[in-house]
Amino acid sequence: MKLPIYLDYAATTPVDPRVAEKMFQCMTMDGIFGNPASRSHRYGWQAEEAVDIARNQIAELINADHREIVFTSGATESNNLAIKGVAHFYHKKGKHIITSKTEHKAVLDTCRQLEREGFEVTYLEPAANGIIPMERLEAAMRDDTILVSIMHVNNEIGVIHDIDAIGELCRSKGIIFHMDAAQSAGKVPIDVQATQVDLLSISGHKMYGPKGIGALYVRRKPRIRLEAQMHGGGHERGMRSGTLPTHQIVGLGEAAAIAKAEMASDDARIGALRDKLWNGIKHIEETYINGDAIERVSGSLNVSFNYVEGESLMMALKDLAVSSGSACTSASLEPSYVLRALGLNDEMAHSSIRFSIGRFTTEEEIDHAIEVITQSIDKLREMSPLWEMFKDGIDLNQVQWAHH
């Protein structure tokens, strides 16, 4: 068993060897290395065909038309293109946008930039289970609302939003609906024909594809218009200029095809491992699951261990590659803004760990993880004066701490 055990699949996934193999065939002189935009020779035609196949594979994963897939450098760019693209194109219709406080930074910071440009953004508060209540969303809608951006699956707590209901509500009000599907594409079934989602962001490296590639689904009927954010040769029907990276796109396509074929079996196996992990640690006193216990993606488990300091817990769990929030913000010692939005206090938010399980996780690794977690919590609490006070029946909320 290789240590540390990788339990951070929500941060990134390893490239599936079958994907890597396909990618390598598009890189060297004896492979499909041409520029897909080179229309005058065979090297370009072959590359264009490889890109077309991948575009179809991604479209099939979400039941879209291949002409609705725009390649980007990843979900961050897809989110930027969707949100800024809509805001800049439809600004005469209205300048109000709705999102939630628990979105990924790629959505929140894009919205903050638009606020600097004169747009108004409403940041919805989730319920305690991490899900945005529909009545809260509807109450925030106005005549000048042009866009709602709500993620499908949360990257920190793994809860799943009811996108059918959100899509239906937005369509009935004539509001464009963007969904960040970085954590759900390839893991949860998505059917854009059945769901009234207008824009959908996809990331390659969250579903066993390469980093640096993603896609944005842009609905054709009813047609959604975007203002390009990247200008140049007019690639991707003018929505995203830049030479298409054939090997990256082929990797994303293959990852999508594998995900579609193996989604049900992956989901069942990963879900069983997640349940095994939770059942192995839930007996530990003062241990709480964050986010909805039912409406969640199979590989995600965010747990707070009360009276244990987050950073010391991370160090104690050195045999496990886990995180205390999203990878994008884990360098900061601030408590997770997602958990704070759920109503957790700073101490509970600080003592939380995100375990995310994936395609290559084994049962043996989960058994070892349970052992490591149990021993580490026991050891840290033995050294904790707060734990001792709690065990003595002292209500720590009533303690008046002296400031020196």
From Swiss-Prot:
It is found in: Cytoplasm. Its cofactor is pyridoxal 5'-phosphate. It catalyses: (sulfur carrier)-H + L-cysteine = (sulfur carrier)-SH + L-alanine. Gene3D superfamilies: Aspartate Aminotransferase, domain 1, Type I PLP-dependent aspartate aminotransferase-like (Major domain). One of its GO terms (molecular function) is cysteine desulfurase activity. The active site is at C328. One of its GO terms (cellular component) is L-cysteine desulfurase complex. Keywords: 2Fe-2S, Cytoplasm, Iron, Iron-sulfur, Metal-binding, Pyridoxal phosphate, Transferase. Pyridoxal 5'-phosphate binds at A75, T76, N155, Q183, S203, G204, H205, T243. NCBIfam families: IscS, PRK02948.1, PRK14012.1. HAMAP family: Cys_desulf_IscS (MF_00331). Master enzyme that delivers sulfur to a number of partners involved in Fe-S cluster assembly, tRNA modification or cofactor biosynthesis. Catalyzes the removal of elemental sulfur atoms from cysteine to produce alanine. Functions as a sulfur delivery protein for Fe-S cluster synthesis onto IscU, an Fe-S scaffold assembly protein, as well as other S acceptor proteins. This is Cysteine desulfurase IscS. The gene is iscS.
